[in-house]
Amino acid sequence: MSVELWQQCVELLREELPAQQFNTWIRPLQVEAEGDELRVYAPNRFVLDWVNEKYLGRVLELLDEHGNGLAPSLSLLIGSKRSSAPRAAPNAPLAAAQVSQAQANAAPASAPAPAPTPAPTKRTTQKTEEISEEPSRDSFDPMAGAASQQAPVRAEQRTVQVEGALKHTSYLNRTFTFENFVEGKSNQLARAAAWQVADNPKHGYNPLFLYGGVGLGKTHLMHAVGNHLLKKNPNAKVVYLHSERFVADMVKALQLNAINEFKRFYRSVDALLIDDIQFFARKERSQEEFFHTFNALLEGGQQVILTSDRYPKEIEGLEERLKSRFGWGLTVAVEPPELETRVAILMKKADQAKVELPHDAAFFIAQRIRSNVRELEGALKRVIAHSHFMGRDITIELIRESLKDLLALQDKLVSVDNIQRTVAEYYKIKISDLLSKRRSRSVARPRQVAMALSKELTNHSLPEIGDVFGGRDHTTVLHACRKINELKESDADIREDYKNLLRTLTT
């Protein structure tokens, strides 16, 4: 019945979608049924991601509308039917995506929770699909042990499992590894420190604290450490979670009078990996509990890795004793990727998606998308989708078409005028000084920095840049750029100034 229901939905999608969209994304899908589960196979990772993002919601609606209350659970996988075993979906955007399906007439649940099992089990009723996710060695559940007193909560939702989902809730993304992390000058130290911790836990840096802006690879490195630890020792208790999850678990434990179980769980792990620690700010009770957990782990020789969007001393609302302890190990910054690294990231992502990306096209995108890796990946996905829809190869012309709104915004945000104003404010001089003939170091050096930034962040030629800096010759601009590049290697102050200005102008 499930396969026939799928075919019915496909025919409805054929009527709803433009022919090109249907033929590109829906027609290649293969399906097979096993019990009440419908397995849908995509030919590659890119198709899986696109279907998951753009069409999954409508597919579920159609299954519900035409399933007479017996809509099957759905799994998205890469590969083909049983003739070819499915393979893992690298970088699948959802490990276990949940789509809300409210059921107004659902009867209240009364069955007791089943005995714990290593992996989640699914129970399907005619009115709703209920997901029972029993506690594993890597997930804290204060309800465990109290099932006989607490009525189970009905989950009025369907869980759609995309291939790559973990069998337990350690929340590690297994597609984030050291092998597919693109290394460059901006993240070289952070990558080396993470590898040291992964390869020599308890003998490396403890805690390891990674900080930097969004989308720069901190979370990737943290997952890579966790995955490597499990590869070396599959029985290791490695727990990754967002700081808000830690807070939520603690609140739940307090509500259920299970705080001792909470403490035992988090203090018994071999490695605790917490993302975005800045969300502990101004949460005094959470900070108190984490302080004692942190101390217990370090005293026991267990590894702790933390990330934040800023240097720990700069996190307002965080207790000084925590800031001090975060400095016991190694604190490393992850910087925005430089041009060469951005190009390498684009080429690697295109290769993973099995898409041919010319080097000049990658260079064109990398020159204009500078802030973080996440924006780079988003831009590349748009270009690839545009290429698929239009049936054209990826060229600079196609990139201009597919990213025209983004490129227009970038050009508007980063102008030479904006650079001059920002540099003048940073060095506390006047814009007129930058344009003047003054050659004192206090003016000449900021002028050179502004010229170098103008060359890196805009599409203006050297003569054009020289013209807006008081009518200077293009050779003066070229000399300024070379000088600043040299000083960034030898002068820590210039390197820090340039990095700060670059961050201000591109975020």
Curated annotation (Swiss-Prot):
Region feature Domain III, AAA+ region, mapped onto this chain: 171-387
Region (Domain I, interacts with DnaA modulators): 1-87
Molecular-function annotations in GO: ATP binding; ATP hydrolysis activity; DNA replication origin binding; lipid binding
Annotated Low complexity bias: 85-110
Single GO BP term: DNA replication initiation
CDD domains, per database record: AAA, Bac_DnaA_C
Keywords recorded for this protein, A-Z: ATP-binding, Cytoplasm, DNA replication, DNA-binding, Lipid-binding, Nucleotide-binding
Binding site for ATP: 215, 217-219
Keyword Electron transport: no
Domain II: annotated span: 87-170
A GO CC term assigned to this protein in UniProt: plasma membrane
Domain comment as written in the entry: Domain I is involved in oligomerization and binding regulators, domain II is flexibile and of varying length in different bacteria, domain III forms the AAA+ region, while domain IV binds dsDNA.
Quaternary state and interactors: Oligomerizes as a right-handed, spiral filament on DNA at oriC.
Family named by the database record: Belongs to the DnaA family.
Job of this protein: Plays an essential role in the initiation and regulation of chromosomal replication. ATP-DnaA binds to the origin of replication (oriC) to initiate formation of the DNA replication initiation complex once per cell cycle. Binds the DnaA box (a 9 base pair repeat at the origin) and separates the double-stranded (ds)DNA. Forms a right-handed helical filament on oriC DNA; dsDNA binds to the exterior of the filament while single-stranded (ss)DNA is stabiized in the filament's interior.
The protein's name in its UniProt record: Chromosomal replication initiator protein DnaA
Originating species: Pseudomonas fluorescens (strain Pf0-1)
Lineage: Bacteria, Pseudomonadati, Pseudomonadota, Gammaproteobacteria, Pseudomonadales
Gene: dnaA
